[in-house]
Amino acid sequence: MTLTKVEFTASLISKYGFDKSVAKQFVEQFFEEIRVALANGQEVKLSGFGNFSLRKKNARPGRNPKTGESVAVSARRVVVFKPGQKFRERVENVKVKS
C-alpha cells in the first residue's frame, strides 16, 4: 500500500480535526518548502526523519535498453534521501510485502 498526498491530508483531517482546505494547503506547502530549499542548493534536515540533499551526477555514456543504441546521458542533479537513525530504527523490523 502506498501513502499518497490525498491520504496524508485525510489523516490530518481525521486525527487533528483540520479543515480539509487547511490540511491540503499544509501538505502542499510542506513539500513546496522542501522543493524550494533544494532548488536553492540547501540541504533539508528533518530531525528524527532524515536529510534531503542534491548530488551532481556527471555526464556518461548510456545505452537505450530497447534498441541497444549508445546514447549520451547528460550531467544532472538528483535528489538524495538519507534516513535518520530514529527513522531507520522504526522501520527496521517492519515486514515488507514480497
From Swiss-Prot:
SMART domains listed in its UniProt record: BHL (SM00411)
Keywords tagged on the record: DNA recombination, DNA-binding, Transcription, Transcription regulation, Translation regulation
Function recorded in the entry: This protein is one of the two subunits of integration host factor, a specific DNA-binding protein that functions in genetic recombination as well as in transcriptional and translational control.
PROSITE patterns on file: HISTONE_LIKE
Pfam families the UniProt entry points to: Bac_DNA_binding
One of the record's GO molecular function terms: structural constituent of chromatin
Subunit structure: Heterodimer of an alpha and a beta chain.
Classification via Gene3D superfamilies: IHF-like DNA-binding proteins
Database matches in InterPro entries: Hist_DNA-bd (IPR000119), Histone-like_DNA-bd_CS (IPR020816), IHF-like_DNA-bd_dom_sf (IPR010992), IHF_alpha (IPR005684)
Protein name, as recorded: Integration host factor subunit alpha
Family designation: Belongs to the bacterial histone-like protein family.
GO biological process: DNA recombination; positive regulation of metabolic process; regulation of DNA-templated transcription; regulation of translation
HAMAP family on file: IHF_alpha
Example of a GO cellular component annotation carried by this entry: cytosol
Domain of life assignment: Bacteria
